[in-house]
A protein has these predicted regions:
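Transmembrane helix boundary and interhelical loop/hinge segments in multi-pass membrane proteins
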Residues: 73, 201-214, 223, 235, ...
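Membrane-water interface segments at the C-terminal ends of transmembrane alpha-helices
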Residues: 26-63, 78, 82-205, 234-254, ...
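Juxtamembrane inter-helical linkers in multi-pass membrane proteins
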Residues: 58-70, 222, 306-322, 358-385
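Glycine/proline-centered hinge or cleavage motifs at structural transition points of membrane proteins
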Residues: 219-220, 233
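Transmembrane alpha-helical segments of polytopic membrane transport and secretion proteins
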Residues: 1-33, 125, 300-337
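Amphipathic alpha-helical segments in well-structured domains
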Residues: 70, 74-77, 133, 162-166, ...
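Glycine-rich helix-loop "coupling/hinge" segments at transmembrane-helix boundaries
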Residues: 62-66, 154, 251-275, 314, ...
């Protein structure tokens, strides 16, 4: 009896010592705390949304279909997938959402990846300016580029709205597929996320070991083979991370499809949420399933990726591709023009719109009459002049100032919280790479 009791006591002491040792390291405490918090904040909303898909909501379509005011039913699933409106409420928005996400990934990775390659691996001119200005679209909200697209290409004849710059100045009316729908939405989102691809892929290009490429050059390996067999596999993690984040963000994007007239799962969710609450929750579940699937594929791909190791030290110089005497200037000029329209022109366009007496009234550009411009949207200090349809101008409007203060407060708080949590989790994970918690 004494021996068995002694063994149990010794085992308890060992367990307690292990627990004490585990919690003596701050990274373990951080992992445990954030593991619990993140699990709860991730699982709880999913459970709530799944429950909402079966729940009967008073005054909505599921209550009408079941004849009940409360309880649970599968009527939402049956109606969404099999009713006459299934094509309008589910299949068309789903197809548009997937196509939008795919095209956004292609545009952002091709544009951002090519830009990263030119900046980091060639003798291109104006690199500092281009690398700085290229980030602007990612800093600006999504809807800014969408509104600029409207301001430039919309026309009363095609979209039924006020004329944009092209229609007002040159009487050019772009086709409807150019102004509204999948094409402009994919282009705008692709341009918005291209800087993100540039940051990730460019970081890999800057820090990658050039020894393998140098070895391929010494062995007289063709350039295309070096690119596809060495360079691309080394930037594969950055490309996959870009696909994951861009695809998920594009799937859930609401402002751009809303402004550019594309029906997606996110826009359909907003329109259905009042009368088709349960069915709208099913749309949210579908979007989450896509996100989880992309995440799993990314994890599987990263686990199976090849590791490249050299027996020497890291090369001190990354080989640069010579674009030629003319090419390095010509490509730089082309990129400067492109970045002007994606980064600087949106700011100028918004500034110009604030001085127009009416939306789409660009008459001062061909009359050169500055009196056609107005500052009423900024400086009107009373409600009678109709500066903001019965409200004072921006600088005298208390609602605008309260909104500005609220926006800044939310932005600062989110930055501090996200930065702190991200730093703590990054520290803990880097210290426990082999841990299951990490």
């Amino acid at each position: 009896m004494n021996q068995s009791a002694t063994k149990k006591t010794s085992k308890m002491v060992i367990v307690l010592n292990k627990i004490k040792t585990y919690f003596s390291k701050p990274q373990n405490i951080i992992l445990l705390l954030f593991g619990i918090v993140l699990t709860f904040t991730t699982v709880a909303p999913i459970v709530a949304i799944v429950e909402d898909t079966f729940k009967i909501h008073p005054g909505t379509m599921d209550a009408h279909l079941t004849g009940k005011a409360s309880g649970y039913s599968v009527a939402n699933y049956v109606d969404l997938f099999t009713s006459k409106l299934a094509r309008t409420n589910l299949w068309t928005p789903l197809l548009n959402t997937v196509l939008l996400a795919v095209f956004t990934c292609l545009i952002s990775i091709l544009f951002g990846g090519l830009f990263a390659f030119l900046i980091t691996r060639t003798n291109l001119k104006c690199k500092k300016y281009l690398s700085s200005i290229f980030i602007f679209p990612y800093i600006m909200p999504q809807w800014t580029l969408a509104v600029v697209w409207q301001n430039v290409f919309n026309s009363n004849a095609v979209t039924g709205t006020s004329n944009g710059l092209l229609a007002s100045l040159f009487n050019i009316t772009m086709p409807k597929w150019w102004c509204l729908g999948l094409f402009p939405s994919a282009v705008v989102l692709g341009l918005h996320y291209a800087p993100f691809a540039y940051i990730l892929i460019g970081g890999i290009f800057r820090n990658m070991d050039a020894n393998l490429e140098e070895a391929a050059t010494i062995l007289d390996t063709p350039k295309w083979k070096t690119m596809f067999r060495i360079t691309l596999p080394m930037v594969k993690p950055a490309i996959l991370s870009t696909i994951l984040l861009v695809f998920g963000s594009a799937m859930g994007s609401y402002p751009v499809p809303h402004y550019l007239g594309l029906t997606t799962l996110s826009t359909k969710y907003i329109s259905m949420n009042s009368k088709y609450t349960g069915e709208a929750s099913i749309l949210a579940i579908i979007m989450m399933i896509f996100g989880v699937a992309i995440l799993l594929m990314n994890q599987m791909s990263l686990k199976s990726r090849k590791n490249y190791t050299t027996v020497t030290g890291k090369s001190g110089q990354i080989s640069k591709i010579n674009l030629g005497k003319v090419g390095k200037y010509l490509i730089a000029v082309i990129l400067i023009v492109i970045t002007f329209f994606t980064s600087i022109f949106p700011i100028l366009s918004f500034a110009l719109e604030t001085f127009l007496p009416n939306p789409g009234d660009y008459s001062f550009l061909y009359t050169m009459d500055s009196s056609a411009l107005t500052t009423k949207w900024w400086l009107t200090d009373n409600n009678g002049a109709g500066a903001l349809y019965g409200q004072p101008g921006i600088l005298h409007n208390p609602l605008i100032w309260r909104a500005f203060k609220g926006t800044m407060l939310v932005a600062v708080c989110c930055a501090l919280i996200a930065g702190t949590i991200g730093t703590l989790i990054g520290y803990a994970v880097s210290k426990n790479r082999r841990s299951k918690w990490a």
